[in-house]
């Protein structure tokens, strides 16, 4: 329920049955930018009924992992949003893919943060939500979140690798990890198998953890640059910190 006095948006949930064409997305080698991602979603899911756009609000999120007294592995994450509409997206297991629960910031899909989502067109837009997770957990106990890094000095420069690997964008890489990874090492293997192209002209890194309590930070940096000179997103490579 919305509480405008407290600057809270609304929270929605959606259960996605079926594969939402992710296997086809992987088979085509992903995409290298948000425009091509929107085109894939339009061609396969929304079929041009609505106009899609993807933007990223300015955020400064944080996470931690911990072990509870009973031995459970915990993954915590906050969103430093002033206000947003959020959606919990439930997806089913499909032919070698895990079931998962993920969180989507509906601002990213162009949903008005100051309005409740009541119209049919807003609901059609939300069919794109499985491709825009900011964090989530799958049924193997793998959790993953995405966070802005603001790399590049005065102006943020997006990571945009340029090798012969297939291409994936920020949120679609997180979707791959949720659907296909059994543990942290498999998440790292997935991330290292693709060229990353950050979405919305900004830069990101990831935290991933699994049911054993193991965790890692995945970040893309230029070995020869410092924060203020890391201005060439094509020269960044994946670094993993356990």
Question: At which residue positions do the language-model features occur?
Answer:
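A sequence-level detector of short, solvent-exposed, charge-rich linear segments
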Residues: 94, 192, 206-210
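N-terminal mature-domain region immediately after signal-peptide cleavage
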Residues: 1-185, 196-200
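Extracellular-facing segments of soluble proteins and assemblies that are Gly/Ser/Thr-biased and enriched
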Residues: 189, 193-194, 202
